[in-house]
Amino acid sequence: MTRLDSVERAVADIAAGKAVIVIDDEDRENEGDLIFAAEKATPEMVAFMVRYTSGYLCVPLDGAICDRLGLLPMYAVNQDKHGTAYTVTVDARNGVGTGISASDRATTMRLLADPTSIAEDFTRPGHVVPLRAKDGGVLRRPGHTEAAVDLARMAGLQPAGAICEIVSQKDEGSMAQTDELRVFADEHDLAMITIADLIEWRRKHEKHIERIAEARIPTRHGEFRAIGYTSIYEEVEHVALVRGEIAGPNSDGDDVLVRVHSECLTGDVFGSRRCDCGPQLDAAMAMVAREGRGIVLYMRGHEGRGIGLMHKLQAYQLQDAGEDTVDANLKLGLPADARDYGIGAQILVDLGVRSMRLLTNNPAKRVGLDGYGLHIIERVPLPVRTNAENIRYLMTKRDKMGHDLAGLDDFHESVHLPGEFGGAL
C-alpha cells in the first residue's frame, strides 16, 4: 500500500503556503492534483505547477465568493461527467500583462481569494478557470474542487484554492498514478493525502448534526422520547428513541444500553423475511424498555448497508439468481458495507452518552463507533430470528462479514409471536 501523510500535515503545509498532493478515488478520476491556497499564490508556485501538471490551472472557490464576483457557469447545462462546476474564465483587470504568465496568473489567483475584490476587478474571458465548490465540501462531493476549498478553510485561510492534475514523468501523455505520485511527493517534500482521508477527518472532528425536535412516542414497548436530528451536509434525518435519563442530575452518561439501527424499509416496515432487521429493531426496543434507560438510534440513509433502496432491490434480484448478499453488492460495483457511523456517534455524544453497552451482533459496528471517542464497555448480542428465507443471508453475514450469529448450522424454522420480547412495557 502506498504511504500517505496525515491530514494535519497537509493542513499545516497549506497554511504555510506550500503545495500538497491530493488523490481521489481510483473509481473516479484516479488522479493526483497539486493543490495550494489561492491567497498564497506566488509566481514561483504557479511556475512549479505549470511545469509538472497539465497547465490547465483552476481556482476552486466556495459559492459565496462565486456569487459576489458574478462568476456564472461556463455552460448553462453542465455535461462534465464528474459534475465539475466550471465558471467563466477570468484575468485580473489591473497589474497583469496578457494574463498567461506565472506572475499574471498568481496575481489573478490572489485577487480571486481577496475578500475585498468585486466583479469589476476581473476581465472575462481570461487565463484562470474558477470552479464553484459544493456547499459542504468533500462531504457533499468527493472532488478535488471541494478538497481544495476544505483544506484552505481548515488552514484558516479564505475558501479558495489552486489545483491542477499532475502529469506522469514516465509517460507525458498520461496522468501520474499513485506510486509515481508518492515518489514525486518525496522528491519535492510534499504531503500526500487522499480525499477519503479528508472526508474521514472532517466526519471525526467537525459537528455535522443539528437537533430539531422532540416528542413523546407511545409504543407497544412503552413510551419513548423521539428526538429528531438532521445531518447538515447530507440532508438526511435521523431519530433517537430515548428511554429514561441518559445524562443529567441523576445520570452521568455511562453504561447506557444503545442500539444503532440501520434503516431497512423492507424489513422494518414491510416485515420482509429476507433479513432480520425488523425483528432486531423490535427486540432492541423491548430490551431498552425493560432496562428503563437507553437509546435506539434509527439511522436513515443506511438502507441496504448504505447502498440505497433501489440498489438493494437490484441486489435482491441477483440473490434470487444465486448470489449471496455480499457478492450481489460487489457484482453491482458497490461495497459490501458502505455505512458510516460518524453521524450516529455525534448524535450519541449530543445525547450525553459517554460509555455504552452496544446492542449488536456485528463487531464492525463496534469498531465504527469506537473510533469517535465513545467507550464501548460491552457488546450485547441480539436474538437471532431464522426462517427459510433469511438463513442463507444470515450465514453469509456470519461467514463473510464476521457477525456473531450462533446456532445457524442447527437451523429450524423459528416461530416468534408479536410482543415476544416484552409486549407493552
UniProtKB/Swiss-Prot annotation:
Pathway: Cofactor biosynthesis; riboflavin biosynthesis; 2-hydroxy-3-oxobutyl phosphate from D-ribulose 5-phosphate: step 1/1; Cofactor biosynthesis; riboflavin biosynthesis; 5-amino-6-(D-ribitylamino)uracil from GTP: step 1/4. The keyword Cell wall biogenesis/degradation does not apply. Catalyzes the conversion of D-ribulose 5-phosphate to formate and 3,4-dihydroxy-2-butanone 4-phosphate. Catalyzes the conversion of GTP to 2,5-diamino-6-ribosylamino-4(3H)-pyrimidinone 5'-phosphate (DARP), formate and pyrophosphate. Residues 205-425 are annotated as: GTP cyclohydrolase II. This is Riboflavin biosynthesis protein RibBA. Zn(2+) binds at residues 264, 275, 277. Residues 1-204 are annotated as: DHBP synthase. PANTHER family: 3,4-DIHYDROXY-2-BUTANONE 4-PHOSPHATE SYNTHASE, GTP CYCLOHYDROLASE II-RELATED. One of its GO terms (molecular function) is manganese ion binding. Pfam families: DHBP_synthase (PF00926), GTP_cyclohydro2 (PF00925). CDD domains: GTP_cyclohydro2. One of its GO terms (cellular component) is cytosol. Mg(2+) 2 binds at residues 29, 144. It catalyses: D-ribulose 5-phosphate = (2S)-2-hydroxy-3-oxobutyl phosphate + formate + H(+); GTP + 4 H2O = 2,5-diamino-6-hydroxy-4-(5-phosphoribosylamino)-pyrimidine + formate + 2 phosphate + 3 H(+). It comes from the Bacteria. GO terms for biological process: riboflavin biosynthetic process. The gene is ribBA. Its cofactor is Mg(2+); Mn(2+); Zn(2+). Keywords: GTP-binding, Hydrolase, Lyase, Magnesium, Manganese, Metal-binding, Multifunctional enzyme, Nucleotide-binding, Riboflavin biosynthesis, Zinc.
